[in-house]
A protein has these predicted regions:
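Juxtamembrane intracellular "pre-TM" segments in multi-pass secondary transporters
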Residues: 2-23, 200-232
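Helix-loop boundary and gating motifs at the non-cytosolic
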Residues: 15, 19-69, 226-267
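Interfacial helix-cap and linker-helix signal at transmembrane-aqueous boundaries
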Residues: 50-51, 82-83, 171-174, 252-253, ...
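Helix-to-loop junctions at the C-terminal end of transmembrane segments
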Residues: 75-87, 277-290, 374
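Cytoplasmic helix-loop-helix junction between adjacent transmembrane helices
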Residues: 119-160
């Protein structure tokens, strides 16, 4: 009879048990990230603020956001070197302080439009630094078996906070834009203090599983080339999200003549789906190849945007949010886990920074491009453009070279004669070939560690 310690009798751990097993600095990171996101009042309503409070046109606001969003690119690029030179903790604290300083100026100063772009640049340098530094900290402290769960928890916390933040921000903005900015700044600085106290400066484990050796540079080919191409291709799944952040508030308030509070409802629906289904999806993605997961993510993105495009209404806005959020969950877990599983520990920070750079690039080009389309052709072509983007991503991931997780490789047989040399060479060749196929999903590390 199997005992409680037998292989087949062990019950799956609850998410609370798995969360408690994570290192304390990671738990602190997840809590502060949630609180910081819940206090992120400004960014989701930035376009509305610039149009209604500062009197800018939609195209001008889009251009200003695009110019200011170069700060995301700079912040993403700075994150890797700062993490390497000063540590993950200092990078996180600096990110929050810069964000607070930029928003302080943006919320209190009146001037020419270029001053708004400059202040937004400073704020978004901080925002661009935070995400890659947080992902690098997770890669440092979480074991390979814990990584998919850790990135899922991080994603859920961020999105739950984003569901609360815009809702509170909308209420604050209805009272006063100054209150909206003040709340954002105070919460960010409090989170910086908590991270400074509870997260150690040096978080490199020094015990990471060996990965493929290679040069320190990020190259289009070579050992880490497949990781680089995956990160770059993820742009096609990031761009629709940025497009929704820019276009949806304007579409809701101008085309549907609804309250800006509905934008907060959309973020809340997004968060409800993430919280309700995120951990369930994390358990199931272990059963599927990475390529399949990425294709399904693109299909869900396309389906959700099709609902919004062809049935443009308040009901369609809410229904589409449920669908595309599922695709967002899958991609947001698969990509950083793939980086952590396949990149040398000393290069993880740079690849996480590159992942953040892709997000920053989307924030740079998407609002400006969609703003021009909206200004010249109206809202519906903007929705058409966003629908096409994940379809392109599906085509790219269908042909991209993708490796399986090293942790999911099958174990060697327990007994049996050694193969002949020719058979051994053939098996070795087959194994090397299989590693480039669409192998098991990144969460297979959880199953293989059981």
């Amino acid at each position: 009879m199997a005992t409680s310690t037998g292989e087949g009798a062990a019950a799956p751990k609850s998410w609370t048990v798995r969360f408690k097993e994570l290192p304390l600095p990671l738990r602190v990171l997840f809590v502060t990230s949630f609180v910081n996101r819940a206090g992120m009042f400004v960014f989701p309503l930035l376009a509305v603020y610039l149009v209604r409070s500062k009197g800018l046109g939609t195209a001008e606001a889009g251009l200003l956001i695009s110019v200011g969003s170069t700060g995301l690119l700079v912040g993403s690029l700075l994150s890797g070197p700062v993490c390497d030179l000063r540590g993950r903790r200092d990078a996180l604290v600096a990110a929050l302080v810069l964000n607070a300083v930029g928003y302080l100026g943006l919320g209190t100063l009146d001037g020419a439009p270029w001053t708004y772009a400059l202040l937004l640049f400073v704020a978004l340098v901080g925002m661009g630094m935070f995400g890659p530094a947080a992902n690098t900290l997770i890669a440092d402290l979480a074991t390979p078996e814990q990584r998919p769960f850790s990135y899922t928890v991080s994603y859920i916390g961020n999105n739950l906070g984003m569901g609360i933040g815009p809702l509170l921000g909308g209420v604050a903005a209805a009272y006063s834009y100054h209150v909206m900015f003040a709340g954002n700044i105070v919460v960010g600085l409090l989170c910086a203090v908590v991270i400074r106290i509870w997260v150690p400066r040096d978080t490199k484990s020094g015990t990471a599983a060996p990965k493929a050796a290679g040069g320190g540079r990020i190259r289009l080919g070579g050992v880490h080339g497949h990781v680089l191409w995956m990160v770059l291709a993820s742009f096609f799944y990031v761009a629709p999200l940025i497009g929704l952040e820019y276009a949806l508030p304007l579409a809701v308030t101008t085309e549907l003549n609804a309250s800006a509070g509905l934008v907060g409802v959309v973020y809340t629906v997004n968060s409800v789906v993430v919280v309700g289904l995120g951990l369930q999806l994390e358990k199931r993605i272990a059963s599927y190849p990475i390529r399949t997961l990425l294709l399904v993510a693109g299909a869900l993105w396309a389906l959700g945007l099709a609902v919004l495009d062809f049935g443009f209404s308040l009901a369609a806005v809410l229904a589409s949010t449920v669908v595309w959020t599922l695709g967002e969950i899958i991609a947001s877990v698969v990509v950083p886990t793939y980086i952590a599983d396949h990149v040398d520990e000393h290069r993880v920070g740079r690849f996480m920074a590159l992942n953040g750079f892709v997000l920053g690039l989307a924030r740079l080009v998407v609002p400006f491009g969609l703003g021009l389309i909206w200004q010249n052709h109206g809202a519906r072509p903007v929705l058409h453009t966003m629908l096409v983007t994940p379809l392109v991503g599906i085509a790219v991931f269908a042909v991209l070279r993708i490796r399986s997780s090293a942790a999911s490789a099958p174990a060697a047989p327990a007994a049996g004669p050694a193969p002949a040399s020719a058979a051994s060479a053939a098996a070795s060749s087959a194994s090397a070939s299989a590693s480039v196929e669409a192998g098991p999903g990144p969460a297979d590390a959880v199953r293989s560690g059981a």
